[in-house]
Amino acid sequence: MNESNIPAALYDVVRRDLKPVRSLVSPERRALALLPVGIALLVGLPEFWSWKSHVVLAPWSSWGTSVVEMLLSLVILAAGFREAVPGRELHNRALTVLLCVSAATFIAVNATMRSPFGISPAHWLRWLRECVVTAVTFSIPALIAPAWLVSRALPNRPGVAGALCGLGVGLMADAGLRLFCWDGDYAHVLVAHGGAILILVALGALSATLIERIKSRVRRIGATDHG
């Protein structure tokens, strides 16, 4: 079939559907582009809380381990962006290794900061609420950019890609959170700081899944209109 015998209506539909595309930047470069977000959470969270409540921040020696945690978050974001590209999905073994490394790093960097005195029962719930709310509030805007980058790549498993992005942003937030909440007991760190990360993982998975469903519905409506 050549152009001369293609039905005019079909030809117009195909021509309208053709749009120039731009190749995706590599997952690593897209993750690196979010370095300013990581720095903003690393510095902004403790500085905001110090300004708000006049708390003493962690010693400068502790900032190095937070930088390590923030750099790991970029690796996880790169994995999430790769997961979002059809045909480049991560194997289950790679996902397992990534999750284990993330958990081990979170436990290790926070193990160096716990207070020998712990938290009194009267303050436990208040500190829990403050840490979770602060981390999630600062991180939700930071999650917008990764969610948008995932949506551009047409993921086959949007929940997995979104969860990895949520994990990456959650570790970014914890890198800053631990610099002003550094004198709590280990149970507080695991429940409050770890809980904030899990909330962001869930939000990342949910947002990516919803975005793909909305895109799919829009495509169906567009196809129906053309038909």
Predicted feature residues:
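Terminal transmembrane helical module of multi-pass membrane proteins
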Residues: 148-227
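Select subsegments of transmembrane alpha-helices in polytopic membrane proteins
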Residues: 30-38, 134-136, 162-167
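Hydrophobic cores of alpha-helical transmembrane segments in multi-pass inner/ER membrane proteins
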Residues: 68-81, 136-146, 197-210
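N-terminal juxtamembrane cytosolic/stromal segments of multi-pass membrane proteins
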Residues: 1-31
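Selected alpha-helical membrane-embedding segments in polytopic membrane proteins
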Residues: 27-122
